[in-house]
Amino acid sequence: MRCQFCHNPDTWQIQGGQEMTADELLNQAEKYRSYWGEKGGITVSGGEALLQIDFLIELFEKAHARSINTCLDTSAQPFTRKGTWFTKFERLMKVTDTVLLDIKHIREDEHRKLTKFSNSNILDCAR
């Protein structure tokens, strides 16, 4: 998607970044455990987090093994019930404590104006 009101697209750095394993990322996150307390944890957002669903599954499974709560912040644009993707999504949901589902607009026509995409798969995900 390319939403009309996306925060600071002029600051995006599409190239670069630092690749990390799930364990490396969790080791970094755990440095803040005293800040988030017993019920806190990690939130994965985007861009669109579901574009990296295999990594999310690994990350959230390992987070749960460490008693870290998990939150997925998503527009659910990639959501589909087709093929193996839905099986992966179900596996991810088993280790996701909270989902923040960002529906840009409930009406199809208004959603298209804002994002240039349909909201049908997003609403399907919400079901």
Language-model features: where?
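Conserved AdoMet/S-adenosylmethionine-binding subsite of the radical SAM
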Residues: 26-34, 38-41, 46-127
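Canonical Radical SAM [4Fe-4S] cluster-binding loop centered on the CxxxCxxC motif
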Residues: 1-20
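A short linear-motif detector with a strong N-terminal bias
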Residues: 5, 21-23, 77-79
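SEC14/CRAL-TRIO lipid-binding/transfer domains and related phosphoinositide-recognition modules
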Residues: 18, 24-27
